[in-house]
Amino acid sequence: MIKAIVTDIEGTTSDIRFVHSVLFPYARERLADTVRQHGSDPEIAQALDALRQELSQPDADSETLIAALNQFMDEDRKSTALKLLQGIIWRAGYRNGDFQGHLYPEVAAQLAAWQQQGLRLYVYSSGSVEAQQLLFGYSNAGDLRPLFSDYFDTRVGAKRETDSYRTIAQAIGLPAEQLLFLSDIRQELDAAQEAGWHTCQLIRDDADSVSRHRQVARFDQIDLPEYAQ
């Protein structure tokens, strides 16, 4: 019997194009000015110090850091410092009303229904916990943060590594057979399944004929009693 559901974001609750066409360009346009004009602000200074450590350049100046950040974005590198700075910029954008977090139309109602049924809800995404909370807190369906019990990012491990799901199960405090992971990526679901989890693949766009996981097109097509069999 499923007692908790852990969901991915990109391609699962939300259109991946929102991240790549809205969030990433918004941060890129403002990153250099943020470093130059606000580099002494405590939160930003901490992120820049983390970047210097990543680069092994403790004395790197602002322009060197900006060049590195632009390179990281070009390479889609999973840099902790870059994620911190992007999160700071996105926070301002959400609060200013420059954009709202995108959710597919059925997601909010289904999440609320599951919570009302007594299920615990969690998020596991490659985006930082703060970025996750911003997306759900300023979503096009309102503030959904009260629906979630907790959030996980890659600090627990990469999403294609089986041990990451063991770590999350331990943090949640439930056995793997009572957990359901939702994602659009087959390899992530493979890792969760290897850890003993139930899985469901969201097919929002292109079909995945290789996958062996249960597949649905929408959250409201997920039939939880099937997982009790």
From Swiss-Prot:
Q: Name one GO biological process term.
A: L-methionine salvage from methylthioadenosine
EC number(s) on file:
3.1.3.77
A Pfam family the protein falls into: Hydrolase
Q: Does the keyword Amino-acid biosynthesis apply?
A: yes
Record text on cofactor binding:
Binds 1 Mg(2+) ion per subunit.
Q: In which pathway does it act?
A: Amino-acid biosynthesis; L-methionine biosynthesis via salvage pathway; L-methionine from S-methyl-5-thio-alpha-D-ribose 1-phosphate: step 3/6; Amino-acid biosynthesis; L-methionine biosynthesis via salvage pathway; L-methionine from S-methyl-5-thio-alpha-D-ribose 1-phosphate: step 4/6
Q: Which GO terms describe its molecular function?
A: 2,3-diketo-5-methylthiopentyl-1-phosphate enolase activity; 2-hydroxy-3-keto-5-methylthiopentenyl-1-phosphate phosphatase activity; acireductone synthase activity; magnesium ion binding
- What InterPro entries does the record point to? Enolase-ppase_E1, HAD-like_sf, HAD-SF_hydro_IA, HAD_sf
Q: Which UniProt keywords apply?
A: Amino-acid biosynthesis, Hydrolase, Magnesium, Metal-binding, Methionine biosynthesis
Co-factor requirement: Mg(2+)
What reaction does this catalyse? 5-methylsulfanyl-2,3-dioxopentyl phosphate + H2O = 1,2-dihydroxy-5-(methylsulfanyl)pent-1-en-3-one + phosphate
Give disulfide pairs as residue numbers. Answer: none
Q: What does this protein do?
A: Bifunctional enzyme that catalyzes the enolization of 2,3-diketo-5-methylthiopentyl-1-phosphate (DK-MTP-1-P) into the intermediate 2-hydroxy-3-keto-5-methylthiopentenyl-1-phosphate (HK-MTPenyl-1-P), which is then dephosphorylated to form the acireductone 1,2-dihydroxy-3-keto-5-methylthiopentene (DHK-MTPene).
Q: Which family does it belong to?
A: Belongs to the HAD-like hydrolase superfamily. MasA/MtnC family.
Q: How does this chain assemble? A: Monomer.
Name of protein: Enolase-phosphatase E1
**Its gene?**
mtnC
